[in-house]
Amino acid sequence: MLSLKKYLTEGLLQFTILLSLIGVRVDVDTYLTSQLPPLREIILGPSSAYTQTQFHNLRNTLDGYGIHPKSIDLDNYFTARRLLSQVRALDRFQVPTTEVNAWLVHRDPEGSVSGSQPNSGLALESSSGLQDVTGPDNGVRESETEQGFGEDLEDLGAVAPPVSGDLTKEDIDLIDILWRQDIDLGAGREVFDYSHRQKEQDVEKELRDGGEQDTWAGEGAEALARNLLVDGETGESFPAQVPSGEDQTALSLEECLRLLEATCPFGENAEFPADISSITEAVPSESEPPALQNNLLSPLLAGTESPFDLEQQWQDLMSIMEMQAMEVNTSASEILYSAPPGDPLSTNYSLAPNTPINQNVSPHQASLGGCSQDFLLFSPEVESLPVASSSTLLPLAPSNSTSLNSTFGSTNLTGLFFPPQLNGTANDTAGPELPDPLGGLLDEAMLDEISLMDLAIEEGFNPVQASQLEEEFDSDSGLSLDSSHSPSSLSSSEGSSSSSSSSSSSSSSASSSASSSFSEEGAVGYSSDSETLDLEEAEGAVGYQPEYSKFCRMSYQDPAQLSCLPYLEHVGHNHTYNMAPSALDSADLPPPSALKKGSKEKLADFLDKQMSRDEHRARAMKIPFTNDKIINLPVEEFNELLSKYQLSEAQLSLIRDIRRRGKNKMAAQNCRKRKLDTILNLERDVEDLQRDKARLLREKVEFLRSLRQMKQKVQSLYQEVFGRLRDENGRPYSPSQYALQYAGDGSVLLIPRTMADQQARRQERKPKDRRK
């Protein structure tokens, strides 16, 4: 009903509604299920009961297709389409659905026709065989006199339309002939009766809870039915010619592997060099389960496939891949490493101990094949073959092995994203290290993205220079940790450690004051007008203008700020860190004395940039005392200081200007301080007033509450006194005519209501007259 509801036209619905309004009962289910096979043929095509299928010649297109083009079973006869659908479904998890068919072997009863049809022409020959018991409505239909035939015949043959009791002999003979012909062709009740198939599902659910004996019997009968073919002309059953399971298995595995190869092509250096034929020969066909062999049989066999076939095929393919990967791994490990019996690396990991890719980085070997990163998780040692076999790579020195990031600087991205356990930061002299399972993924995904070849040309560094840096500054926590190696490669990872590196690389007080000016952004902290005025003088001493790097942050792209760092001149620019030590150019390295002298000059230039304009002018005029004394000394001491030295007019005028500007600055600071103190005092006064206001509001609320309570008490007292008053006759006074009035001396008078109202009006007018 639900599957065919959308095909009903609007006119049919309107006609049904009209009939229901008139009072005629319309049973739509009978028209949509078993009573209308033509409607189902229009929608789904003719069923197999009416189609003469060529069982012996399915592929012969000269006589027409064996299956109707509109049949829903057409897809099962195309092997390529079925295999493609199975291969595409390998990466999806499918919950298997079990179907259990139970068969009961018994003899048919002699009276196979119900009592309403006494004619013996409809009775079939009773013989022992397999009878489907999936019809749950045997008892119901036998009691219905409208059904002209028994349930036994309905299960074995087609469904006849409901007939009355006045059938002629010709009609009964025609029905008998058609019925026998349908039974001979193999068309049962389930082909025609749609509601019968719906009821079969309910019966199957009940039969699933049965014993194991019925289940095995049902599977055997189903297998027997699948192995039998029915002749279209004679209706005879004969066993099917099943091809050998070995050929079918090998052919299907070849097709699956070929489809996998087309979906995920391997590179030139594939991890699986063996061909497909050798793989299929290595796997014995006898080890295939029966479910897989049944699934790989010819599509001529009918029946439902096992729900575990796809899962079993996927497991077989994965086992083949693992076997071949194990062959490659064992051959590689025999060449590279022969482990002793007690080696923990061989017992725990079964891998050859290779050098991690972070220690021997070669830009030419950083890229992998097209599909290598998918299989890298299964065999990580395959990727390490070209790295471990290359003898031209230079390992790090033991003094620098504690921090590999000092060797590569910003190019070693693994130190920025992964902990030291995965980065391979252990000492090289400690022994063989564990392989890095993420090295290949990082090399292909990260190093290709940042163009490692360009970095090797622009920003490389030398391990020998790193060792000299460590000897120069007597600390491996200063410049060896993420420090800059060239003015153009100052990256964001070095900005966070610039304060620590600058403070630990020198021991003098001037260096500590210089380190305090660094922020986390890596630039100088205080900027004044003296920096812009003295840039030209400083550039002459530096002699180098660094170029901007594509990895440099915007805050680092000031050449004046980069040139003032004292340790940048020791950084060489020889980018051949993959070469041997003999190939290094020693002419680029200055002597240690020149390095120390240059560092002092750089430090002096850096301190010069931190001085103000007046300090630079005082140094240029060679004034013998500091600006602090000029500004902060009292008048008497200042005059004595000037009298001790022989100063020129220009020097005296400069000293007076410095003192005047310093005093003005101090006066301005004092003025700002007084203003701030005044503002703070006003804020405190405002807070005090707000507290007083809140206190007065609370008191007002208390007064109003007490006044309200007093009025209530006076009102109650007034009513009590007025109720006790009596006239001469002993009657109480009326509240509408009389009222009580309080006198100034405390006495209470009883007056008429009109007089009391007049006095109240006069008292109200007095405040108004005063306001005017």
UniProtKB/Swiss-Prot annotation:
Query: Where does the record place the modification Phosphoserine?
Result: 528, 599
Any one of the GO BP annotations: cholesterol metabolic process
Q: Does the keyword NAD apply?
A: no
Region called Basic motif, residue ranges: 656-675
Renumbered to this chain, the Low complexity biased-composition regions fall at 476-523
Q: Region (Cholesterol recognition/amino acid consensus (CRAC) region): which ranges? A: 191-199
Motif extent (Destruction motif): 476-480
Task: Write down the CDD domains for this protein, in alphabetical order.
Answer: bZIP_NFE2-like
Q: Where is this region: CPD?
A: 379-383
Q: Where is this site: Cleavage?
A: 103-104
Q: Where is this region: Disordered?
A: 108-148, 470-532, 753-772
Q: Which UniProt keywords apply?
A: Activator, Cholesterol metabolism, DNA-binding, Endoplasmic reticulum, Glycoprotein, Lipid metabolism, Lipid-binding, Membrane, Nucleus, Phosphoprotein, Repressor, Signal-anchor, Steroid metabolism, Sterol metabolism, Transcription, Transcription regulation, Transmembrane, Transmembrane helix, Ubl conjugation
Q: Where is this motif: Nuclear localization signal?
A: 761-768
Residue positions with a glycan: 348, 412, 423
Give me the segments passing through the membrane. Answer: 7-24
Region of interest (Leucine-zipper), ranges: 682-696
Q: Where is the composition biased (Polar residues)?
A: 113-131
Q: Where is the bZIP domain?
A: 654-717
Bias (Basic residues): 763-772
According to the UniProt entry, its GO molecular function terms are: DNA-binding transcription factor activity, RNA polymerase II-specific; lipid binding; RNA polymerase II cis-regulatory region sequence-specific DNA binding
Pfam families in UniProt:
bZIP_Maf (PF03131)
Task: Give the family from UniProt.
Answer: Belongs to the bZIP family. CNC subfamily.
Q: What is known of its domains?
A: The cholesterol recognition/amino acid consensus (CRAC) region directly binds cholesterol, as well as campesterol and 27-hydroxycholesterol. Has much lower affinity for epicholesterol.
Spell out the subunit comment: Interacts with KEAP1.
PANTHER family cross-referenced by the UniProt entry: ENDOPLASMIC RETICULUM MEMBRANE SENSOR NFE2L1, NUCLEAR FACTOR ERYTHROID 2-RELATED FACTOR
Identification of the protein by name: Endoplasmic reticulum membrane sensor NFE2L1
